[in-house]
Each structure stands twice: as C-alpha cells, then as structure tokens.
C-alpha cells in the first residue's frame, strides 16, 4: 500500500508540474516562432537597371551588373509568354513586349504553336528587378526580375510584379522593402503560352490574397 501511495504521489507531482510548465513551454515556443518569422523576411532593393544599382551602391558596379544580367536571364526563363504580339501588348501596353528566345523554357510543342501563329512567342520587357542577399548567408546577391504594365486596364498597371503575378507596389525604382525570403527564390520556367489577360488575372488574384492576409494579420494583432 505504501508503494502504491508513493506512485500516486509521484503521478500527482508530475501532473502538477506539467500543468504549471505548459504556459512557460508555450511562451518559449512562441518566442522561437517569432524569431523564425523575423528571419524569414529580407530587405531588398528595387532597381530599373544596373546603372541605378551602381549609383545607389558606389563600389558595387560589378555586382550590380552581374545581378542585372542574371535577372534578365531569369526573365527570359520565367516571364509570361504569349503566342502573339497582340496578346502581349493587350496585357502590358505598346512598346513593352519583345520576342522571346526560342529556348526560354518553352516546350517544343508550344514553340511550334507559337511560331505557327506569329513566327515566335512574345514576352514583356523586364521593367526592373529586386536585389537582395543570397539565401543561406552567401557573399553574393540574389535577384528577381519584375514586370509592369502600361495598359490602364490591366491589374498590373503601374505596379511591379514578379513572374508569378505577385504585386510589389508601385513601379518606382530606387526604393527598398521587406519581402519574404521565398520572394527571391527562383520561379519555375514558363512552359506554356498565356491567354490574353491571363497574367492580369493572376495579378488580381495574388493582390486579393495579399490584402486578405494583411487583414487577417491586422485583426490578429488587434486581438
């Protein structure tokens, strides 16, 4: 009986300790989660070209040129592609489209379809690029091409957007902003052509999701 009593007392002590330590454990977990969130964000700079970057970063001209050229290559690989020039212009505006290199991520059957309709496929010009530190703390820089529409009817009008349609605010180079580290991750190559207005729809959906997420965050902070 004494032994049984001892076991019950031990169980009681463990139960009491668990109940009283749980809030502390939760608090510690919350701190680590917050720390993780802080580390998941990154400050990036937005530039129109290598000259803008060099002017803002004296002594970093070589790095700026490398980042700009890498962004151009990434734009060729990931930008929305259109079967005709007219489809691209309808989305991004006159003077904002160019013929895309035939090897820029398109599957052979899609290349054939595009070339049959217009001799090539089309993509928007890179309007600017984001530049930030490499993920993992490397010494180099990461970059992400940005696109912008000059067609007032497009959801991307006057805004910087990435290849996935995510909106990064006004198409105004020379500013800095905080973005999730995932924003700088390479985007998948474009392997199919986009229908007219399709990219604008992606931008509209992404913007709605961003507003919804921001509203949820504000309500959570406000209790």
UniProtKB/Swiss-Prot annotation:
Domain of life: Bacteria
Region (Disordered): 201-223
Signal peptide limits: none
Stretches with biased composition (Polar residues): 204-223
Pfam families according to UniProt: DUF1190 (PF06693)
NCBIfam families: PRK11653.1 (NF008655)
Protein family (similarity comment): Belongs to the UPF0441 family.
Name listed for the protein in its UniProt record: UPF0441 protein YgiB
């Amino acid at each position: 009986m004494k032994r049984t009593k001892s076991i019950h007392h031990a169980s009681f002590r463990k139960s009491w300790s668990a109940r009283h330590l749980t809030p502390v454990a939760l608090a510690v977990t919350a701190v680590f989660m917050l720390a993780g969130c802080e580390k998941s964000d990154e400050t990036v700079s937005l530039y129109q070209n290598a000259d803008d970057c060099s002017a803002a970063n004296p002594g970093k001209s070589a790095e700026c040129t490398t980042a700009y050229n890498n962004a151009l290559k990434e734009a060729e690989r990931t930008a929305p592609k259109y079967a005709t020039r007219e489809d691209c212009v309808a989305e991004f505006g006159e003077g904002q489209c160019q013929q895309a290199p035939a090897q820029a991520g398109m599957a052979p059957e899609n290349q054939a379809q595009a070339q049959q309709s217009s001799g090539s496929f089309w993509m928007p010009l890179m309007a600017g690029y984001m530049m930030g530190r490499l993920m993992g703390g490397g010494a180099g820089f990461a970059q992400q091409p940005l696109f912008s529409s000059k067609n007032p009817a497009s959801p991307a009008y006057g805004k910087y957007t990435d290849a996935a349609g995510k909106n990064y605010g006004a198409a105004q180079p020379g500013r800095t902003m905080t973005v999730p580290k995932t924003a700088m991750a390479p985007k998948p190559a474009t392997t199919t052509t986009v229908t007219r207005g399709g990219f604008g729809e992606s931008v509209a959906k992404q913007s709605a999701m961003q507003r919804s997420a921001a509203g949820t965050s504000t309500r959570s902070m406000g209790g």
